[in-house]
Amino acid sequence: MSFDRNQDGKLKVKTSSKLPVSPTFESMKLQENLLRGIYGYGFEAPSAIQSRAITQIIRGKDVIAQAQSGTGKTATFTIGMLQVIDSSSKDLQALVLSPTRELAAQISQVVRNLGDYMNVVALACTGGKALQQDISKVNKGCHVMSGTPGRVLDMIKRRIINTRHVKMLVLDEADELLSETLGFKQQLYDIFTKLPSSVQVVVVSATMSKDVLEVTKKFMSDPVKILVKRDEVSLEGIKQYHINVDKEEWKFDTLCDLYDSLTITQCVIFCNTKKKVDWLSHKLIQNNFAVASIHGDMKQDDRDKVMSDFRSGSSRVLISTDVWARGIDVQQVSLVINYDLPELLENYIHRIGRSGRFGRKGVAINFITREEVTKLKSIEKHYSIKIKPMPADIDSLS
């Protein structure tokens, strides 16, 4: 895994106080086996957010860390967490909560990869699969649990997991976790009441709304804030275009035309509803296009299979709702198509960031009906960007 060092260096980092910056992982005084895992994972030097946040996490400070999608946020809290975990004990010591099952699974894998030489056990505990599977794994010992709030709270209430020794709680994609729409907020409150009062809290997100900052005041003690202001969140590596289609029903033909014209490695197509995802994937398959689809109503085994096939490259076009937009890193994605513009302005960066992970170049194409012109202008204003009309010379995009 790598990121564009020049791109990362352009990010302006704002902190609540003058924090020390660690130019190398060695300067953080990390355990030797953790350094082996970091370099084995492909990191060479810390990113802007890593160079500031990791040492604060290790010191035991509560931390609010905001960085753009693809700058190494997951590795930031994972490295800090692994440094302070006592692997000689079988106790659960760190809890990571995420808004989606896929993200929770990915985080547990990152913990295992970075902690490869440390004998650290990390489990993903999410809904959609038999509880008994998680119980048998937890009983063998678990240092880090990465899960969704509902499943984790259920396991705490059933006394399947013991939280007495949890010293760190991480809220990943906190803006989503703490939003009213997903209904996780009360579950998070309930989980907090089951943790030791001394628990260290780390909040990580690509966007940080005022509501999130207010909610974190309830749970955090004098947190260190490391923030990238919204208008400094870089979309520089991603070419963004729009295609005017006038009517909704014309979007499908436009998409088919793009398939014939664009040479793509892998592509993600976003729709706003599960029904639209099912409809579009069915219609494309009817027209002999090979596509896969994923959304929250699918069985967990089916979702895992879709993600596995897409990661391996055996499927190259994925149609999805916003469930896939946050945090999932598939490095080969070079094109994102917004079949529908996102309902929430904040989700625009999560969606199109799929095509420009870690500073890689990508293309984002937005289908715009007459009714969506106003929404497009709102996105441009929100991110201080200009989304250009699609050029006639499509070959120039690649």
Curated annotation (Swiss-Prot):
Tagged with keyword Translocase: no
Keyword RNA-binding: yes
Gene Ontology biological-process annotations: maturation of SSU-rRNA from tricistronic rRNA transcript (SSU-rRNA, 5.8S rRNA, LSU-rRNA); mRNA splicing, via spliceosome
EC number per UniProt: 3.6.4.13
Gene Ontology molecular-function annotations: ATP binding; ATP hydrolysis activity; mRNA binding; RNA helicase activity
Motif (Q motif): 23-51
GO terms for cellular component: catalytic step 2 spliceosome; FAL1-SGD1 complex; nucleolus; preribosome, small subunit precursor; small-subunit processome
Family: Belongs to the DEAD box helicase family. DDX48/FAL1 subfamily.
UniProt free text on domains: The Q motif is unique to and characteristic of the DEAD box family of RNA helicases and controls ATP binding and hydrolysis.
Protein name as annotated: ATP-dependent RNA helicase FAL1
Species in which this protein is naturally found: Eremothecium gossypii (strain ATCC 10895 / CBS 109.51 / FGSC 9923 / NRRL Y-1056)
Lineage: Eukaryota, Fungi, Dikarya, Ascomycota, Saccharomycotina
